Amino acid sequence: MAKSTRMTFCSFCGKAQNEVRKMIAGPAGVHICDSCVSVCKTIIDRELSGSEEGEARRSAEGGKKGRFNLLRPAEIKARLDEHVISQDYAKRTLAVAVYNHYKRLRDGLHTDSKADLSRMDSDFRDVEIEKSNILLLGPTGSGKTLLASTLAKMLDVPFAIADATTLTEAGYVGEDVENIVLRLLQAAEYDVKRAECGIIYVDEIDKIGRKTDNVSITRDVSGEGVQQALLKILEGTVCNVPPQGGRKHPNQEYIQLNTSNILFICGGAFVDLDKIVQSRVGSKVMGFDTLHDRRHSEVPVSELLRETQPEDLVRYGMIPEFIGRLPMVAVLDELSRSDLEHILQNTKNSLVKQYGKLFSMEGVKLHFTRDALAAIAEKAIELKTGARALRSIMERIMLDIMYDLPDSETAEEVVINRAVVDGRGKPKIKHGEKRTAKPGKSPQAQASESSEDAA
């Protein structure tokens, strides 16, 4: 009779024996995996070495304006302009909000210079500035995530992205809200003090709106329940974060992290919110015209969204307490064809520049005609996914030429025109003299190949 083998599981993280490299057995059927042992060692080492050395390091870091680069609003907007086309209203709003947030942190860390203190009125020195989280409203592909990530890079602070649709209320299948904070802690390489000055971007926040206004016996664990769970984290609380993530359980080791100084940026498309605003505004005068007199199709969605009030978001499904913790609202415009053309070629890491670099590695120049760029932008508008559509369109256009190019030894320049974008033609290749060096191979390797061919 075959001997049955019983699968063992880690008593800490719950992983099976075949999912880890080593499982260590303890008394009374308790087991621990090598990954959890490593985490425990890290926690113990941090606590043991966190006395004198840790205090010295933290005080040294505290002298550097609170461990982040504090830029003026104009500088922040100028940096954002390098990466994000258009969206001036949103960039100005973000620049002011971020500047005030990190100035608040610097004040809280008591690292202001003597010049700053001398300018400050004595009546305000004991005033505590409250945190202002940010809500981004805008269509998909308009640059919400890019704005948030660019802010984190320029400020040199940890940054994490979370998807609100994966979150559920504690005790139900799905991710706990503490896992959002865990991602930030991981981005900070488990440096708690650094993580406490970071930025968290919560995407698809509109998807956790209350499903219905009707009272139901069924609990809304992924909608209103998640909003309730996020309240304390947004406002500021000390979270007990499990180092390995997952669900909490008794006797588990936690890392404590204060969210009071973490900047939360929540973003969502909020589809049809403009209709709610339209119904509320009615005949309210805007300039020399009224929304009542103009057909809805003639009013830009972004213009309506700028009139958004908390009551509109409540009607959309967000609870009042949640909205109150996102006082700063920035609206992003839907990208036009000219915006998409600028994104293709004029941003710091534009797709045209990225593909140009790939081609230059092969010793070949890449050129897009103006009508080709216009055609790509038109196709992106048809797909209705904003700037996200640009890469998929470019990948399709460039697939064949990038497949054949490495085998060509005489190609000097590749020209992409509208016919290529529309699928009615092939890229034009200008040939020259045979290249002496093949990209990707060293001169020694090529010399060896040549000698073998001669032999």
Predicted regions located by residue number:
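AAA+ P-loop NTPase nucleotide-binding core of proteostasis motors
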Residues: 2-25, 49-160, 165-173, 178-455
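Membrane-proximal soluble domains of inner-membrane proteins
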Residues: 8, 38-41, 45
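The −1 position to Zn-ligating cysteines in a subset of zinc-ribbon hairpins
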Residues: 9, 29-32
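Cys/His-coordinated zinc-binding microdomains
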Residues: 14, 34-37, 41
